[in-house]
Amino acid sequence: MGLLFVELLPRHGDGGGPASAVLKCRRCRVDAASADAILSRDFRGRFGRAYLFDHVVNISLGPNEDRYLMTGLHTVKDIYCSCCQQILGWRYEKAYEESEKYKEGKFILEKARMWKEAR
């Protein structure tokens, strides 16, 4: 196994504006996503509230798994912190309902597994 590459999120908002908060793995505090990049806060995960994102960093993916979620059957991959292997949420691979297709390729991060750091 080689060296672990950790991606750090920018310290300032786009255009050098005010600094934005960063969501980090609660266990090891490695960056996972910018709070400004949350697409929706209206999701529920295994541990309560969850957020939808287009892009997250410092994760590894588990195998495809079919799951019945609140909105129907989806194929998902669990996402793990690349540093400590804590499960952080999942990525939608396939949605079987036409109304849920917008989720494909997007990520869910569970609020209970995140630490919010204001920058």
Curated annotation (Swiss-Prot):
GO MF terms here are: metal ion binding
Residues forming coiled coils? none
The UniProt keyword set, sorted, is: Metal-binding, Zinc
Metal-binding as UniProt keyword: yes
Does this entry carry the keyword Transmembrane helix?
Answer: no
The source's domain of life comes to Eukaryota
- The residues covered by the Yippee domain are 21-118
Extract the InterPro entries matched here: Yippee, Yippee/Mis18/Cereblon, Yippee_fam
Give me the residues that bind Zn(2+), please.
25, 28, 81, 84
Q: Could you say which protein family the record assigns here? A: Belongs to the yippee family.
Q: Which protein, by its recorded name, is this? A: Putative yippee-like protein Os10g0369500
Species name: Oryza sativa subsp. japonica (Rice)
**Highest classification ranks of the organism:** Eukaryota, Viridiplantae, Streptophyta, Embryophyta, Tracheophyta
